Regions:
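Sec/Tat signal peptide C-region and signal peptidase I cleavage site
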Residues: 19-24
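Extracellular Ig-like/FN3 beta-sandwich strand-entry sites
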Residues: 43, 95-97
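Short N-terminal segments immediately surrounding and downstream of signal-peptide cleavage
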Residues: 25-43
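Bacterial N-terminal signal peptides that target proteins for export
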Residues: 1-9
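Short, surface-exposed alpha-helix to beta-strand junction/turn motifs within ectodomains of secreted
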Residues: 46-47, 52-74
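Extended, polar beta-sheet/loop recognition surfaces of beta-rich domains
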Residues: 39-41, 45-52, 109-122
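Short, exposed beta-strand-loop hairpins at the edges of beta-sheets
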Residues: 90, 94, 101-117
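Bacterial N-terminal signal peptides
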Residues: 10-18
C-alpha cells in the first residue's frame, strides 16, 4: 500500500474509532417498578424509559395481572419533558405477580415490543 493511502486509512480509522454508534429503535432502558422487582407498596403508575422517543398514538402499554386481565387505567401518556418515557396509571394493585407489556413505535418509525414482570408483596 502506498504511504499516502496508508496514512489516510489510519487517520480515517482513528476518527471512526472515536465515534459513538447512533441509537436506533426504542428499546427498554429501565422501568419503574424495576424489571423483575418485588415492591412492598402498589405503584400508582408504571413508567418505562426507552432509548429514544416514541410516538404515542402508535404505542401501547398494558399491565396484566396473574390471570392475564388488563388492570391499567386508560390514561397512557408521555412525560411532557421526556418523549422517551411512556407512563400509564394503575389502580391500587393487590398482592401478586404482574406483567408489563409494551409495543412502541419509535420516532425513527421502527416498532419494538417486549414485557417484564414485577410483583407486589407487602
Amino acid at each position: 500500500m502506498k504511504a499516502p493511502m496508508k496514512k489516510l486509512l489510519i487517520a480515517l480509522s482513528c476518527c471512526l474509532a472515536g465515534m459513538s454508534p447512533a441509537r436506533a429503535h426504542a428499546f427498554l432502558d429501565h422501568a419503574d417498578p424495576k424489571v423483575g422487582s418485588t415492591v412492598k407498596v402498589s405503584p400508582t403508575e408504571i413508567k418505562i424509559w426507552f432509548t429514544e422517543g416514541v410516538i404515542l398514538p402508535f404505542s401501547d402499554l398494558k399491565v396484566l395481572d396473574a390471570s392475564g386481565k388488563e388492570v391499567q387505567k386508560n390514561d397512557k401518556h408521555l412525560d411532557p419533558a421526556h418523549p422517551d418515557v411512556l407512563i400509564v396509571s394503575v389502580p391500587p394493585l393487590k398482592p401478586g405477580k404482574y406483567k408489563v407489556s409494551w409495543r412502541v413505535t419509535a420516532v425513527d418509525t421502527h416498532v419494538t415490543h417486549g414485557f417484564f414482570p414485577f410483583e407486589v408483596s407487602p
